[in-house]
């Protein structure tokens, strides 16, 4: 692939069940893998999605187009999972839980960090991009409203970007 398409940036979608062969192929390719913060806080088992376990050669996401927004996840997740996220990331009401999760991704060692605009705006499930396996239902229709990106939010994003050298 690298020979046929030089200069093309490729991300290995290494989500879900990972066999040793798939892990070896990703490592051999050198392509960065995906780390989704929402997957980190399943309180039932240890997780490679926790930021302290990230390799640098990865991309950290708050969620993907197929995930709930962070605000929806916080409302829908099991209490133990949210409690684990609160403890691990030091989430508090003053900063806001959604903002604290974004901070957790921004401060990770991942080479890249991606947050959905819905998460920066702390929007709920009505702004979810896609519900897998469901046709219609507003999938792929969300658009940011004019004026939603305020100067205050832009300054906040810029400050976090500078603070964490992103």
Which residues does each PLM region occupy?
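Catalytic cores of glycan-processing enzymes that make or break glycosidic bonds
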Residues: 1-166
């Amino acid at each position: 692939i690298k020979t046929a398409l030089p200069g093309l940036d490729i991300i290995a979608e290494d989500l879900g069940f990972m066999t040793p062969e798939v892990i070896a192929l990703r490592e051999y390719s050198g392509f960065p893998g995906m780390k989704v913060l929402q997957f980190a806080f399943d309180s039932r088992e240890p997780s490679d999605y926790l930021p302290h376990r990230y390799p640098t050669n990865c991309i950290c996401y708050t969620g993907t187009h197929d995930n709930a927004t962070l605000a929806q996840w916080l409302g829908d997740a099991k209490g133990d999972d949210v409690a684990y996220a609160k403890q691990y990331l030091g989430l508090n009401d003053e900063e806001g839980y959604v903002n604290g999760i974004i901070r957790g991704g921004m401060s990770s060692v991942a080479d890249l960090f991606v947050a959905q605009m819905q998460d920066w705006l702390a929007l709920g499930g009505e702004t979810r991009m896609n519900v897998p396996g469901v046709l219609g239902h507003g999938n792929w229709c969300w658009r940011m409203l004019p004026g939603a990106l305020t100067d205050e939010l832009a300054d906040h994003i810029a400050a976090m970007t500078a603070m964490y050298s992103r």
